[in-house]
C-alpha cells in the first residue's frame, strides 16, 4: 500500500507538471521557479509526515536525513545540466521538456541502482567501508572544487552517440527523434537528454553510498531520492540566484559526507542513533545557509 501511495503522488505531480504548469512550454520566471521549488519541498515534507505515522519516528528521521543529503548533493547536477543546455544551445522553452523526461529516467535508473546496492551490501557488508572511503574523498574534494564540471566533447558517451547515431545539425522544434528519407535521426534535444541521464548516474555514485550509511530500507532511500530530485527541475530555473546566495552549503555538505564516513567506520563499536545523524545533518546545513546569508549581506553593504 505504501508503494501505491508513493507512485500515485509522483504520477499526480508529473501530470500536474506536464499538463497544467508547463502545458504551453512557457518560460518559467524566477518567482515561479521559487514557488514551485517550495511546492515540491512541502510535498516532500508532507510525505515525511506520512512515513512518520505509517512506520514511526526513526524511519521518518531517516527519510528526512536522506532527503536533505540527496537534495544538497544534487545541486551540482544543476551546474552540469546548465553546461549541457548551453553546449547544445537548447532554448528555455524546450529545457523543461528535457528535464521532465529526464526525471522519468531517473525514477527507473535510481530504482535499479538502489535495489542493486542493497543486494550487494547485504551480501558483502565490507562494501560499506569502500563507500566510506569514496565519501571521504568526495568530501575533501568538495572543499577545493567550486563545482563539478563536464567536458562534453571529450566524454565517452558523447563520442559514442556521434559515432553510432544519425544526428540532425539543428533542433527540430521540441522533437527528440525525427524521420528523414526513411532514416531516424536524433536531435540535439535527444543527445542532451541522454547526457543528463548519464550524468545523474555518475553523480548517484557519490550520493547513494551516503544514503546507504543512513539506512538500508529501500522504501526510505528510494522515496527520499525521488522527492529530492523532483524539486530540482524547478530549482534549475533560479540557479544563478541560489549559487550566489548559498555559496557555503558546499562546505556543509563536505562535512556531512565526512561525518557519514565516520559513522560507517565506527558502527560496529558505537551505534550513532538516527536522531543524532539527522540533527548533525540539519545543523551543518543550517550553518552553511546562515553563513552564506551573512556573507551575502556583508558583500552587499
UniProtKB/Swiss-Prot annotation:
GO terms for cellular component: plasma membrane. It is found in: Cell membrane. InterPro entries: Integral_membrane_TerC, Integral_membrane_TerC_rswitch. Keywords: Cell membrane, Membrane, Transmembrane, Transmembrane helix. It is a multi-pass membrane protein. Belongs to the TerC family. This is Uncharacterized membrane protein RC1219.
